[in-house]
Amino acid sequence: MDSSCIDEISSSTSESFSATTAKKLSPPPAAALRLYRMGSGGSSVVLDPENGLETESRKLPSSKYKGVVPQPNGRWGAQIYEKHQRVWLGTFNEQEEAARSYDIAACRFRGRDAVVNFKNVLEDGDLAFLEAHSKAEIVDMLRKHTYADELEQNNKRQLFLSVDANGKRNGSSTTQNDKVLKTREVLFEKAVTPSDVGKLNRLVIPKQHAEKHFPLPSPSPAVTKGVLINFEDVNGKVWRFRYSYWNSSQSYVLTKGWSRFVKEKNLRAGDVVTFERSTGLERQLYIDWKVRSGPRENPVQVVVRLFGVDIFNVTTVKPNDVVAVCGGKRSRDVDDMFALRCSKKQAIINAL
């Protein structure tokens, strides 16, 4: 091989190596260099240095209303701050609805002069209703979407108690309250079972009563997802339950909201729940409850033997024990008592 061929091969090899090295060391294209400046409301602004333009890529649209924040599922949340702590007011389908909920909470937390989204958010009597309830109660109404219903029921009740048949104010609220109670009709009663007040978080409505008093809108109950039904208790509090048909068990049930009712009223198996309806034009539904009469059943006692002593749990209520019921809640002071029984001396010693 002559020297000219060697020179040509060397030069071509050098050129290819130089081109490869230059290709590896070349900077990335300008379009790949982007700086991100994060903005409020979950939005990000992309800065493109090549053409000097700003393009905005929004993940969640921000709201124009005070106290309203977007949610990943497309809905809108409402929140308010109290002593540097965030108080969640619930999630809503429309941001206007969330804004009104914020306004209501702001009026309760900060008074009539609070900064709100809409003017004239409070009507006559609304401020008195807010002041008559605690902040926690108002927040609970907003979260459960029952504020409007409870306000409406309160206004009707106040109007009925203050005006007689001739349109004049009546100072005797007790007499009017008796009339209110007399205008109700009892639909049905049910003694709740252990599963009704257990961890299933549902109340089974007897089929004959469900189809007669609470018919579902769909011709076939199996295809409906259920409806929300509002009930008012004896204290004027509105309870909203989801009422639906379970095709698996072929039963009508109250689900969402029922566990909260069981917890607040301290319901136990055997207690009786009463469903009522007003005879007036509004056809308002009511719910009430009462403690089962008679002694409770004696449960099976679990005995543990420790150091020659039988230790067992006494869960029955003795005749001399007092069970107090006040405001729909009963005392549990006598429920949990322990007794020691010595195996040698058949004496029972109650220890608190």
From Swiss-Prot:
Does the keyword Endoplasmic reticulum feature in the UniProt annotation? no
Biased composition (Low complexity) is annotated at 1-25
GO annotation (BP), single: cellular response to hypoxia
Q: Which residues bind DNA?
A: 64-119, 188-291
Q: Where in the cell is it found?
A: Nucleus
Q: Name one GO cellular component term.
A: nucleus
* Annotated protein name in UniProt: AP2/ERF and B3 domain-containing transcription repressor RAV2
Recorded source organism is Arabidopsis thaliana (Mouse-ear cress)
